[in-house]
Amino acid sequence: FEKWKASAARREIVAFVTRLNNSCVNKPNLTIDAAPPQVRKLMDALRQIAKGCDQYLPKPGEARRYGSPMFRDWHAWLVSSTPGLVSSLGADNAELSARLAASFGDRTRIDYGTGHECAFVVFLLGCFKLQLITDGDVDSGAVVCGCFAEYVRTCRIIQRCFGLEPAGSKGVWALDDYQLLPFLFGCSQLSDEEHGFGDEDTGLLTVNASALAQRSMFYECLAFVDESTGSTPLDVAAPILFNLTMQPWRTNARRLLRLFDEEVLGQKPVVQHMLFGELLRADWDVSEGPSEESERLARMKAVMDAANRKLGIGS
C-alpha cells in the first residue's frame, strides 16, 4: 500500500480529476442533446445501464436485511452487457469493460461507495487514453457536466432501486452515504456564485435544491441528502456537508479535492479493490508482493463468462 501511495498511478488519477474539476468551472449540467457526439454515446450507455434495473426490480415484500438480492442478478446482466456498451463507444477492450462493470457497486456485498465512483473516473481516463473522448470533450466541461452528471443520476437510480448499502459509510461525518466527486465538481460549477445554501441558526436549507439540480451537481446531491434525511435539520443529519455553506465555492472545491486524495486514494480499504492493467499500470515491482491486478482481471473475466452462460449468451 505504501508503494501505491507514492505511485505514478495515484498521481495520474489526481491529475485527471484536477483537470476534470478545472473544466467545469462556472458551467451548468449538460443535456444529452447538447453534448458532443462521443459524450452523447457515453451518456446513452449510462441510460441503458439505468434502464436495465427495470428487468430486475425487487419483489414487493421480499425478505431482506440489507440490499435487495436482485442486485446480484442485475449486476450479472451489467457484466454481460458492458462489452457491447464499450463496443458502441468505438472500442473492443476487455479492461475498459471490466472498469465500467466495477463502477456501480459490489455484487457480493450489495453496496456502493467512493471506490466504485473512483472506478468510473479511471474508466473515463481509459476512454481518454483510447481516444474515445478528446481533449476538447474533457476541457470543454462536457465529460463532467454531461457524462459524469449522468453517471451520478444512474447511480442514484441503482441505489434507490436495490437499496444498496453504503460502502464504508461514515454516517453523519460524510458528505452523503455514497458520493464525493459530484460535490467537488458541483462546487466548481458554482465557483463565482454567492456561497451559502443553509441557515446557520436553524440548520435548514435556504435554497430549493431540487429546483437548482440542473444548475449544478452539488444541488442535485444536496437534494438527495435532504430527501434521505427527512425532517432532520441538515446541520444535524450531515454536519460536514452543512459546514460547506460557510465557505466560498472555490474554497470548498480545494478542500474536497484534497479530501478525495486523502480519504479515497489514501485509504487501503478503498484502493485495494482497484484494477490495474494497460490503462492504469502498477508502476512498482509486483514481484515484491501478490500480483493482484492480473488476478482481479481474471476474476472479472470469469464473472463475465458465468453471467454470459446464465443469460445464454455465447453458449
Q: Predicted segment positions?
A:
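Glycine- and acidic-residue-rich phosphate-binding/metal-coordinating active-site segment common to enzymes
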Residues: 123, 130-175
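Well-ordered alpha-helical scaffold segments within catalytic/enzyme domains
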Residues: 123-134, 183-193
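N-terminal leader regions that mediate targeting or early regulatory function
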Residues: 1-103, 107-117, 141, 145-149, ...
